[in-house]
Amino acid sequence: MLIQRGGLKVVAGLGISGVSAVNFLHEQGYQVAVTDSRPTPPGHDQIPAGVKTSFGQLDQELLLQAEEIILSPGLAPQLPEIQAAIAKGISVVGDIQLLRRATDVPIVAITGSNAKSTVTTLIGLMAKDAGKKVAVGGNLGRPALDLLKDQPELLVLELSSFQLETTSHLNAEVAVVLNMSEDHLDRHGNMLGYHQAKHRIFQGAKKVVFNRDDALSRPLVPDTTPMQSFGLNAPDLNQYGVLRDADGTLWLACGLQRLIKSSDLYIQGMHNVANALACLALGEAIGLPMESMLETLKQFKGLEHRCEYVKTVHDVRYYNDSKGTNVGATLAAIDGLGAAIEVKKGKVALILGGQGKGQDFSPLRSSIEKYAKVVVLIGEDAPVIEQAIQGATKILHAATLKEAVELCQRETQAEDVVLLSPACASFDMFKSYNDRGQQFVACVNSLV
């Protein structure tokens, strides 16, 4: 272990990663305390005896006694209690920083506004299928520090901008920002703040992967850092992209080498082609054999609530993209499915709405105009979205998700698709995006 024993470590904010940090530090023999503004925060019953707890408010006095504060990703460093500690010279880090100090196991680090979970899961499976002892987690599934219990030879981490804010010099084996679109501006203030947080992933990276189609994903790293790119265009030598045959067949390719037809993948839509290419680039960077990666890719069926195929009813296919909680994700889903069904004159019936998080919805206009026959609006920010897309296509309103699904069924015909991709958070009407997705699936299954 490379970790140093020292003074009091105060974990601010419980939840999954907070509990994980408390237990990890306690096991390492540190003096640990924890504070949370909630009177009974989730995980409060999983705190070891001997750890001081202060719940009901962020305990300013306790924070100022800390040698170091471990900030949970749900809490902003801008909070006055945290700023007071920073002003006193107290170090503020997150669980990812603790992980980096505790191990020198190579890390594949993945962030982006969208597709993080799909890419993280897929590259994890590719590594496992190639015989690596890999542990996958971070912002997805298991908290990062818990992964060390597996004694892995490789860590694959999905990282959010909130986690990266408190991480420096991650020194990843390979790092990628998959894409950048407006999200969490309520936390980061503006696009620049969000961009800066995301790009912390590249600090000390040995290799980097970037998206040629998204200039904001390209890192500023030393010229000596090996760089690999992916994009939905013809690739240069040794880069990843797509090649089209004269008959329209689309191939995933590396340089001029055709690797696999897009039609051979379970995961459909151009956004998923980009995800697959990103994984191939990441896999190459950590030395995974191409043949093994392509085999994994052929078997991969995608993730729940992420452009997940639900059912076909009267020749209309229904897709659950409840994880589409921002404009960029929804654009990828509309464009991906819209382009795929356009050949057969199919159109998209789109369910949009929820809590908009201060986003600008106008970038949806042109794709809605091109691919959507109807948009059904739900939730708190329906009026904001309506204003942004007015005139692009037919707009309807629904008070419930069930009503929205029924309206879509009424408006569609054979070869069309119904897509739930709300571009919004779910908490106005649902417990979570999972809950929203499950309710959508139940509504679709009850259609006749």
From Swiss-Prot:
Q: Name one GO biological process term.
A: peptidoglycan biosynthetic process
What SUPFAM superfamilies does the record point to? Answer: MurCD N-terminal domain (SSF51984), MurD-like peptide ligases, catalytic domain (SSF53623), MurD-like peptide ligases, peptide-binding domain (SSF53244)
Residues given in the record as ATP binding sites: G112, S113, N114, A115, K116, S117, T118
Gene Ontology MF, one: ATP binding
- Which keywords accompany this UniProt record? ATP-binding, Cell cycle, Cell division, Cell shape, Cell wall biogenesis/degradation, Cytoplasm, Ligase, Nucleotide-binding, Peptidoglycan synthesis
Q: In which pathway does it act?
A: Cell wall biogenesis; peptidoglycan biosynthesis
Where does this chain mainly localize?
cytoplasm
Going by the entry's taxonomy, the superkingdom of the source organism is recorded as Bacteria
Question: What reactions does this protein catalyze?
Answer: UDP-N-acetyl-alpha-D-muramoyl-L-alanine + D-glutamate + ATP = UDP-N-acetyl-alpha-D-muramoyl-L-alanyl-D-glutamate + ADP + phosphate + H(+)
Q: Which of the seven top EC classes does this enzyme belong to?
A: ligase
- Which Pfam families does the record match to this protein? Mur_ligase_C (PF02875), Mur_ligase_M (PF08245), MurD-like_N (PF21799)
InterPro entries of this UniProt entry?
Answer: Mur-like_cat_sf (IPR036565), Mur_ligase_C (IPR004101), Mur_ligase_C_dom_sf (IPR036615), Mur_ligase_cen (IPR013221), MurD (IPR005762)
One annotated Gene Ontology cellular component of this protein: cytoplasm
Q: What is its EC number?
A: 6.3.2.9
Compartments it resides in: Cytoplasm
Family, as annotated: Belongs to the MurCDEF family.
What is its biological role? Cell wall formation. Catalyzes the addition of glutamate to the nucleotide precursor UDP-N-acetylmuramoyl-L-alanine (UMA).
Name of the protein described by the UniProt record = UDP-N-acetylmuramoylalanine--D-glutamate ligase
Q: Which organism is it from?
A: Acinetobacter baumannii (strain ATCC 17978 / DSM 105126 / CIP 53.77 / LMG 1025 / NCDC KC755 / 5377)
**What gene name is listed for this protein?**
murD
